[in-house]
């Protein structure tokens, strides 16, 4: 238990924020007990993994519970590998664990920061692959009554960086473990960036893993050097008519057709076209290598990051008439606040 302690080491933006209390839990019963104790005392409660997708705007006037649930189990049948990983396991370490056992499938999701329990919330994705493709179940606890239950993939209502855990199960519930189902008949996903150079007939999952790690390491800043939360904005999805108008004005715009007929745009490219790389407000800046990443360049505050995000959204809106939506969760004094509203 840590009283009135800095949250700086508990989130990757490394902003100067404190919490009344920080408790690392290693069992589900401890999580339930501490959550109920804080709730009875009318204390706000925030459950964190590695804090890789949060922005603290102020000191948190409540209790922060840090997920340290550990353990990975594996079984298999003729066609599939089944993995159950506890919510506090590091996601990238899990990807490495699967590859060490010659289990392919997760290699495109290498080096995504955070813990396993956060993966379903965001439906994390990268390089043409999303978490939902491998989700077998998500194990959840109702913190109010201690009931533990599983949701299958359909019940998770996955969308682009979205799930039921951002809505119906946002409050009073916690993800304690995740079940993955990985086919033994592996098909590589090579339709993104430099992965297209590989042949589907000869490439190995380890080669894809190494390439993805190299790409991410070259483009994304190390949080220990410059605090950040990875991609700050989602890639916007627009209808085909709107896209046609934008493409007429900007023929070179990169785009990704979606199965439903809509078009996904590259948020980083849009920001870059607004000449915002390196743009700075206080200690917060747009990263010079990857415009989609906002960084804590020099002792930034949460409010400075918000101001920077506001400017980015406004410039992109003005130039392209496209709305960027924050991917990062904004945490105020007593809990999550509306990132859309605060950066409008």
Curated annotation (Swiss-Prot):
Which reactions fall under this protein's catalytic activity?
Answer: UDP-N-acetyl-alpha-D-muramate + NADP(+) = UDP-N-acetyl-3-O-(1-carboxyvinyl)-alpha-D-glucosamine + NADPH + H(+)
Task: Name one molecular function that GO assigns to this entry.
Answer: UDP-N-acetylmuramate dehydrogenase activity
GO terms for biological process?
A: cell division; cell wall organization; peptidoglycan biosynthetic process; regulation of cell shape
Q: Name one GO cellular component term.
A: cytosol
Q: What is its EC number?
A: 1.3.1.98
- Per UniProt, residues of the FAD-binding PCMH-type domain are 15-185
Q: Which residues form the active site?
A: 161, 231 (proton donor), 327
Named in its record, the pathway it takes part in is: Cell wall biogenesis; peptidoglycan biosynthesis
Q: What class of enzyme is it?
A: oxidoreductase
Q: What is its main location?
A: cytoplasm
Tell me if Cell wall biogenesis/degradation is a UniProt keyword of this record.
yes
InterPro entries (alphabetical): FAD-bd_PCMH (IPR016166), FAD-bd_PCMH-like_sf (IPR036318), FAD-bd_PCMH_sub1 (IPR016167), FAD-bd_PCMH_sub2 (IPR016169), MurB (IPR003170), MurB_C (IPR011601), MurB_C_sf (IPR036635), Oxid_FAD_bind_N (IPR006094)
Q: Which cofactor does it need?
A: FAD
Keywords (A to Z) from UniProt: Cell cycle, Cell division, Cell shape, Cell wall biogenesis/degradation, Cytoplasm, FAD, Flavoprotein, NADP, Oxidoreductase, Peptidoglycan synthesis
Cell compartment(s), UniProt:
Cytoplasm
Q: Which family does it belong to?
A: Belongs to the MurB family.
Question: What is this protein's function per UniProt?
Answer: Cell wall formation.
PANTHER family cross-referenced by the UniProt entry: UDP-N-ACETYLENOLPYRUVOYLGLUCOSAMINE REDUCTASE (PTHR21071:SF4)
Stated name of the protein: UDP-N-acetylenolpyruvoylglucosamine reductase
Q: What is the organism field in this record? A: Haemophilus ducreyi (strain 35000HP / ATCC 700724)
Name of the gene encoding the protein in the UniProt record: murB
